[in-house]
């Protein structure tokens, strides 16, 4: 049996990308953002089509993402942040709540969101991961923007076929 298969599309030309970056753990978050923006450019996304906003910390990322998603101006969004374990339970709270919020926004607004909020035990781990994770976020955003547009087109094609079937039935009646 032969099945249809979608091949990942990393062509960013014409895509509009919104980025929300935490300022907490700023050196790491700036490293994430630099790598992400460089990779978006490498993938063909124009600087004019990228909006980067900053928020105080990881817990504020979901609200900013929601506002960007509500605007319907972006094909994909990216969350950038760094939550580094400290001495208290706060690490788990921030990690879990920011991640859940990011996922909820993606599902509620049918908008792809690349989650590059690092959760690490140490500053050194975060620094070691920031460049590759920033690049990865750009690739995920572009790939998922293209995938969702393709899947949306499938839905539109199916609706068009249903409309044609309804018209045929009306003509026969």
UniProtKB/Swiss-Prot annotation:
Q: Where is this region: Disordered?
A: 150-173
Kindly report, in one word, the top-level EC class recorded for this enzyme.
transferase
User: Please, which domain of life does this record's source organism belong to?
Assistant: Bacteria
Instruction: Give the family, as the similarity comment puts it.
Output: Belongs to the DMRL synthase family.
Q: Enumerate the residues binding 5-amino-6-(D-ribitylamino)uracil.
A: 24, 58-60, 82-84, 115
Binding annotation for (2S)-2-hydroxy-3-oxobutyl phosphate? 87-88, 129
This enzyme's EC code(s): 2.5.1.78
Q: Which residues form the active site?
A: 90
Q: Name one GO biological process term.
A: riboflavin biosynthetic process
Name of the molecule in the record: 6,7-dimethyl-8-ribityllumazine synthase
In Gene Ontology terms, what is one molecular function of this protein?
Answer: 6,7-dimethyl-8-ribityllumazine synthase activity
Q: Which Pfam families match?
A: DMRL_synthase (PF00885)
**Which pathway features in its UniProt record?**
Cofactor biosynthesis; riboflavin biosynthesis; riboflavin from 2-hydroxy-3-oxobutyl phosphate and 5-amino-6-(D-ribitylamino)uracil: step 1/2
Q: Which spans does this entry mark as compositional bias, Acidic residues?
A: 154-173
State the organism's lineage.
Bacteria, Pseudomonadati, Pseudomonadota, Betaproteobacteria, Burkholderiales
Mind listing the UniProt keywords for this protein, alphabetically? Answer: Riboflavin biosynthesis, Transferase
Instruction: Provide the function of this protein.
Output: Catalyzes the formation of 6,7-dimethyl-8-ribityllumazine by condensation of 5-amino-6-(D-ribitylamino)uracil with 3,4-dihydroxy-2-butanone 4-phosphate. This is the penultimate step in the biosynthesis of riboflavin.
Q: Which gene encodes it?
A: ribH
Q: Which NCBIfam families match?
A: lumazine-synth
Q: Which reaction does it catalyse?
A: (2S)-2-hydroxy-3-oxobutyl phosphate + 5-amino-6-(D-ribitylamino)uracil = 6,7-dimethyl-8-(1-D-ribityl)lumazine + phosphate + 2 H2O + H(+)
Q: Name one GO cellular component term.
A: riboflavin synthase complex
